């Protein structure tokens, strides 16, 4: 399985074989491709971050956002707005920019047939769709995907507790 976890501060891609992590890569050096990146873009566009997915899906094309740096991407978005570019097209471009960044990380560990996406960003259908397009794989998410990490930690702790009780 391939697990893609996009949170507020970092992006992680894991390769899982028979329940064991066999490969891992993480982008934690900058905000590009993270929930924080989307927060900044939503603020510049004057929309709610939770509306980005819906708005991006109303686009007929996407405006290329070439900068991976949040600060430079913010400047690109401001420039597009000053040219009166359709906000939905800009948002679609943002989704593709994030997907391109995440796909680059995913290709470093190798993408398997079963792809699962977790973290709050997985609630953004625009990013999920753009990433599916980039990877050529269906991406599975859950409605409460932002809690997957906490649930996994709780299960791990419970299993450890049970083992310790057996002595």
Where are the predicted features?
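Gly/Thr-rich phosphate-binding beta-strand-loop-beta motif of the actin/hexokinase/Hsp70
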Residues: 1-17
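Active-site nucleophile and cofactor-binding loops and adjacent substrate-binding regions
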Residues: 4-8, 25-33, 91-95, 116-121, ...
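Adenine-nucleotide phosphate-binding core of ATP-dependent small-molecule kinases
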Residues: 73-106, 146
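Glycine-rich phosphate-binding/hydrolytic loop that grips phosphoryl groups
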Residues: 35-39, 142-167
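Glycine-rich phosphate-binding loop plus the immediately following alpha-helix
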Residues: 18-61, 155, 159
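Glycine-rich phosphate-binding loops at beta-strand->alpha-helix junctions
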Residues: 106-134, 145-149
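Internal, active-site/partner-interface "lid" segment
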Residues: 47-79, 166-167
């Amino acid at each position: 399985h391939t697990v893609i976890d996009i949170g507020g501060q970092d992006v992680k891609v894991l390769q899982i074989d028979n329940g064991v992590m066999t490969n891992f890569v993480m982008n934690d050096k900058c905000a590009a491709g993270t929930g924080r990146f989307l927060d900044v873009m939503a603020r510049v566009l004057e929309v709610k971050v939770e509306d980005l997915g819906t708005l991006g899906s109303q686009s007929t094309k996407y405006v290329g956002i070439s900068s991976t740096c949040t600060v430079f991407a913010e400047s690109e978005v401001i420039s597009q707005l000053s040219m009166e570019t359709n906000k939905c097209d800009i948002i679609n471009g943002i989704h593709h920019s994030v997907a391109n960044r995440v796909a680059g990380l995913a290709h470093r560990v190798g993408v398997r047939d079963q792809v699962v996406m977790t973290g709050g960003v997985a609630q953004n259908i625009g990013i999920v769709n753009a990433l599916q397009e980039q990877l050529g794989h269906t991406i599975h998410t859950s409605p409460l995907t932002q809690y997957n990490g906490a649930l996994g930690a709780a299960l791990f702790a419970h299993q450890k507790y049970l083992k310790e009780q057996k002595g």
